[in-house]
């Protein structure tokens, strides 16, 4: 685990974004942990989050021309990542996002920001079922651009209905990498090292044994 990954997990726990206990997921599974990126909900938290995304962008080595934030949750994530890449890594890159509804006045269309062209890095919080990413791929294709990869905050590393995770299905179907700031593997490492949170380790390990990939 890299230093920025450890710092991100600590930050997510401090903000209440990553919590341990008993949670019912949309899938119906009872999970021993829950991740809600919507709780990075202050200016300072968003600025810091962008720096973690930027670190993961650099770490991934993915070659791309433009950042894309899918509506709605991906919009502030792409914006703060673009700011952090420029300020922390001297990489001033274009970014854009889509609207869910097309406008018939002003700039029109469903895309806002820089042109969606060349190699596109998609920025989002998590991939649950992969439905949102499939919609994004249609937007990218329609612009004649191509997806270079996807960056998310957390990879839960768990199976969907079949043997693969939604992330593995996206990688297989579109031939592109999906990378994350951290995965469940790093969360487990963090729990091992943290005296106070170690008590949650057996439940998380049992969950991974049942649903992990």
UniProtKB/Swiss-Prot annotation:
SUPFAM superfamilies: PRTase-like. One of its GO terms (cellular component) is cytoplasm. GO terms for molecular function: magnesium ion binding; orotate phosphoribosyltransferase activity. It catalyses: orotidine 5'-phosphate + diphosphate = orotate + 5-phospho-alpha-D-ribose 1-diphosphate. Pathway: Pyrimidine metabolism; UMP biosynthesis via de novo pathway; UMP from orotate: step 1/2. One of its GO terms (biological process) is 'de novo' pyrimidine nucleobase biosynthetic process. PROSITE patterns: PUR_PYR_PR_TRANSFER. InterPro entries: OPRT, Or_phspho_trans_dom, PRibTrfase_dom, PRTase-like. Keywords: Glycosyltransferase, Magnesium, Pyrimidine biosynthesis, Transferase. The keyword Glycosyltransferase applies. CDD domains: PRTases_typeI. It comes from the Bacteria. Orotate binds at residues 34-35, 128, 156. Its cofactor is Mg(2+). The keyword rRNA-binding does not apply. Its EC number is 2.4.2.10. 5-phospho-alpha-D-ribose 1-diphosphate binds at residues 26, 72-73, 99-100, 103, 105, 124-132. Homodimer. Belongs to the purine/pyrimidine phosphoribosyltransferase family. PyrE subfamily. Catalyzes the transfer of a ribosyl phosphate group from 5-phosphoribose 1-diphosphate to orotate, leading to the formation of orotidine monophosphate (OMP). This is Orotate phosphoribosyltransferase. The lineage of its organism: Bacteria, Pseudomonadati, Pseudomonadota, Gammaproteobacteria, Pseudomonadales.
């Amino acid at each position: 685990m890299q230093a920025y990954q450890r710092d991100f997990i600590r930050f997510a726990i401090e903000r209440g974004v990553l919590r341990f206990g008993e949670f019912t997921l949309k899938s119906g599974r009872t999970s021993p942990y829950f991740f809600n990126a919507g709780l990075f909900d202050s200016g300072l938290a968003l600025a810091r989050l962008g720096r973690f995304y930027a670190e993961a962008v650099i770490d991934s080595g993915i070659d791309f021309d433009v950042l894309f934030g899918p509506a709605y949750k991906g919009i502030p994530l792409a914006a703060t990542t673009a700011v952090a890449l420029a300020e922390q890594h001297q990489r001033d890159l274009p970014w854009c996002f889509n609207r869910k509804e097309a406008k018939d006045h002003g700039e029109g269309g469903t895309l806002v920001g820089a042109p969606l062209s060349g190699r596109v890095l998609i920025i989002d919080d998590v991939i649950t079922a992969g439905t949102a990413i499939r919609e994004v791929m249609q937007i990218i294709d329609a612009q004649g651009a191509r997806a270079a990869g996807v960056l998310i905050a957390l990879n839960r590393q768990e199976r969907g209905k079949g043997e693969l995770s939604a992330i593995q299905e996206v990688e297989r179907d579109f031939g592109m990498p999906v990378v994350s700031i951290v995965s469940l593997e790093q969360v487990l490492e963090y729990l091992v090292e943290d005296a106070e949170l170690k008590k949650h380790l057996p439940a998380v390990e049992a969950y991974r044994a049942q649903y992990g990939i």
